[in-house]
């Protein structure tokens, strides 16, 4: 750019020092660092007030917490189990048709306890309603654990399902047994109630299992995200996805409270 194109600048007029006497000196103006400190102090103040309010609320609720039934707290503590992350993977053993090996695998899920536990002084110590009496031990009672009840139901449904497919239950037999299980015309129906190995009892119990399992699944309400599988990502089988699961310390608990059959 040529010299003749240079812009002209005019000198600003000098300011009379006395005209600035009404302004605050810059040494008294807050710096950026001071403003940061002020914001930090404000944050800590708000945090302190919130913490104090929370502490006060806890102290106010303390009498209520202390009056909480200690037996209920003891029961919750007794039943608490640690969790772990488990990635579900296919298990052909449990997906296979009945065989001595697969049947044994399913049966072993119930363990020696078969899903029942024995508690001493359950009504006084744990706040439980009366359980099944234990012979020769009036202070103890037997209760069931829901996870094993659910497994028992799956085992029962599996038996009926494959029994129908393999011809152990023919269609006519199935409908007759279903009528009997519903309280049909069979006059010996009440006797079937006591035959827990009979087909009538198993069919009736399986009907109960469908209802019990749907309630159990909805009660657990697991909200863990499952990723799609397959080349087109359109298969949702639950495999390959992490799930938060109870650790199998449960088996130790069941053994410690195992019902000893005489």
From Swiss-Prot:
The pathway entry for this protein reads as: Mycotoxin biosynthesis
Recite the UniProt keywords alphabetically.
Answer: Glycoprotein, Membrane, Oxidoreductase, Transmembrane, Transmembrane helix, Virulence
Q: Where in the cell is it found?
A: Membrane
Where are glycans found on this sequence? Answer: 170
Residue span of motif HXXHC 1? 149-153
GO terms in the biological process aspect are: mycotoxin biosynthetic process
Phenotypic consequence of gene deletion: Abolishes the formation of phomopsin A and leads to the accumulation of a deoxy derivative of phomopsin A.
Keyword Oxidoreductase, does the record have it? Answer: yes
Which residues span the membrane? 39-59
Annotated GO molecular function terms are: oxidoreductase activity
- Enzyme class, UniProt record, top EC level: oxidoreductase
Enzyme Commission identifier(s): 1.-.-.-
Domain of life (superkingdom):
Eukaryota
Q: How does the record say this protein sits in the membrane?
A: Single-pass membrane protein
Short sequence motif named HXXHC 2, residue ranges: 205-209
Which Pfam families is this protein grouped with? UstYa
Gene Ontology cellular component annotations, sorted alphabetically:
membrane
Q: Which InterPro entries match?
A: UstYa-like (IPR021765)
The protein's matches in PANTHER family, at most eight in alphabetical order, are given as: TAT PATHWAY SIGNAL SEQUENCE, YALI0B05434P
Q: What is known of its domains?
A: The 2 HXXHC motifs are conserved in ustYa family proteins and might form active sites.
What the protein does? UstYa family oxidase; part of the gene cluster that mediates the biosynthesis of the phomopsins, a group of hexapeptide mycotoxins which infects lupins and causes lupinosis disease in livestock. Within the pathway, phomYa catalyzes the hydroxylation of C-beta of Tyr. The pathway starts with the processing of the precursor phomA by several endopeptidases including kexin proteases as well as the cluster-specific S41 family peptidase phomP1 and the oligopeptidase phomG to produce 10 identical copies of the hexapeptide Tyr-Val-Ile-Pro-Ile-Asp.
Q: Which family does it belong to?
A: Belongs to the ustYa family.
Instruction: Provide the protein name.
Output: UstYa family oxidase phomYa
Q: Which organism is it from?
A: Diaporthe leptostromiformis
Gene that codes for this?
phomYa
């Amino acid at each position: 750019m040529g010299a003749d194109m240079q812009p002209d600048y005019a000198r600003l007029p000098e300011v009379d020092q006395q005209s600035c006497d009404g302004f605050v000196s810059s040494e008294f103006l807050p710096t950026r660092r001071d403003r940061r400190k002020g914001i930090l102090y404000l944050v800590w103040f708000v945090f302190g007030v919130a913490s104090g309010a929370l502490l006060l609320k806890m102290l106010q609720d303390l009498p209520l917490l202390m009056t909480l039934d200690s037996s209920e707290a003891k029961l919750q503590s007794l039943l608490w189990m640690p969790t772990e992350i488990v990635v579900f993977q296919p298990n052909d053993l449990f997906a296979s048709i009945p065989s001595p090996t697969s049947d044994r695998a399913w049966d072993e899920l119930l363990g020696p306890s078969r899903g029942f536990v024995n508690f001493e002084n359950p009504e006084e110590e744990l706040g439980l309603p009366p359980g099944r009496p234990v012979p020769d031990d009036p202070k103890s009672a037997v209760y069931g654990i829901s996870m094993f009840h659910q497994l028992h139901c799956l085992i029962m449904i599996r038996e009926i399902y494959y029994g129908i497919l393999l011809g152990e239950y023919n269609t006519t037999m199935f409908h007759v047994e279903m009528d009997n299980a519903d309280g049909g015309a069979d006059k010996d129906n009440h006797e079937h109630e006591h035959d827990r190995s009979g087909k009538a009892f198993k069919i009736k119990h399986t009907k109960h299992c469908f209802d019990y399992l749907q309630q159990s699944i909805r009660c657990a309400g697991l909200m863990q995200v499952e990723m799609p599988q397959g080349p087109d990502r359109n298969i949702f089988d639950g495999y390959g996805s992490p799930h938060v699961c109870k650790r199998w310390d449960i088996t130790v608990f069941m053994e410690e409270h195992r019902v000893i059959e005489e």
